[in-house]
């Protein structure tokens, strides 16, 4: 099966193929993924990079502007680049690889993140037989954020064998825009920082502007960040996981959805749940209309999960979402 489920990830942990600086990481296991957490080591760096054949420790010496100790809370300023070492280490077997993506909250806060590995030639992919540390590049784009050691911004999924590209179904995803209704939120230009450990704490109207269009469309402004929702209701069975793959630029002049993974059980509490879409325009304003295609949801089969699927039982934050901002807002 392409995705390893919770029980199969637990086996990797018991076999010391996933291990951590922390005493236990069992609580970090999701239905078909593992939360990755920040260590205390973090650096503000001059530029993004891909290691290729250069040791990351050498790159840090070349690019580091300052070292930040995350054993206590620290500011990560918007539009600056940071590299944080993660707590987790891997000793993957030769038939298992990993792929990382931002968690839902990370995407909704417009925090651009990418996992980097030693000798890595692309972001977010962990090769078969990889043995070593993991690092996370962090670029807050709309808000300055406050973070601390053990915070999770990303998650990793694991694939077995060569089945990672086997899709069992795919569905086009479009955007929902309704006139005279709150149809989107736009991030405000604000200097106040957001402490990511504070849940249901911040007033949304201080950080977000409600978009209420007069027609079933509106213009997204260049270099602005928006939260919208899909027209389609998504329902992921207990023996499935899904990933939202953004369409190519030929479908629109924007980037959509930073956090594109859906766990088994998502939307199973009712007839389905809309996907929340994170959208940022490129270099020009762009009109977006109700029903406009933005991506494709690819379904993959996994071994069925009998319990601890996505939802209220495992304290999932967005199990009953509609057009929902990050969990830090009330």
PLM segments and residue spans:
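DUTPase catalytic domain/fold
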Residues: 1-330
């Amino acid at each position: 099966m392409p995705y390893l489920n919770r029980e199969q990830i637990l086996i990797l942990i018991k076999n010391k193929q996933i291990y951590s600086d922390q005493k236990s990481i069992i609580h970090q296991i999701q239905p078909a993924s593992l939360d990755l957490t920040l260590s205390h080591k973090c650096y503000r760096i001059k530029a993004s990079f891909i290691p290729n054949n250069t040791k990351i420790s050498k790159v840090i010496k070349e690019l580091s502007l300052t070292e930040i100790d995350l054993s206590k809370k620290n500011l990560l300023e918007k539009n600056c680049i940071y590299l944080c070492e993660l707590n987790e280490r891997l000793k993957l077997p030769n038939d298992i690889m990993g792929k990382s993506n931002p968690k839902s909250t990370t995407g909704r806060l417009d925090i651009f993140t990418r996992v980097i590995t030693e000798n890595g030639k692309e972001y977010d992919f962990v090769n078969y037989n990889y043995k070593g540390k993991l690092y996370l590049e962090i670029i807050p784009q709309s808000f300055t954020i406050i973070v601390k050691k053990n915070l999770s911004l990303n998650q990793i999924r694991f694939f077995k064998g060569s089945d990672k590209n086997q899709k069992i179904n795919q569905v086009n995803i479009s955007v929902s825009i309704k006139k005279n209704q709150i149809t989107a939120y736009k991030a405000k230009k604000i200097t106040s920082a957001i402490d990511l450990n504070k849940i249901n704490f911040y007033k949304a109207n201080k950080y977000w502007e409600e978009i209420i269009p007069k027609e079933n469309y509106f213009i997204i402004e260049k270099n602005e960040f928006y939260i919208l929702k899909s027209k389609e209701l998504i329902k992921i069975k207990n023996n499935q996981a899904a990933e939202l793959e953004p369409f190519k630029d030929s479908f629109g002049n924007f980037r959509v959805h930073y956090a594109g993974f859906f766990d088994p059980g998502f939307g199973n509490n009712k007839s389905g749940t809309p996907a929340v879409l994170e959208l940022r325009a490129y270099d020009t304003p762009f009109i977006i209309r109700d029903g406009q295609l933005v991506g494709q949801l690819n379904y993959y089969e996994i071994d069925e999960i009998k319990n601890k699927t996505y939802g209220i039982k495992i304290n999932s934050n967005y199990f009953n979402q509609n057009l929902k901002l990050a969990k830090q807002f009330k």
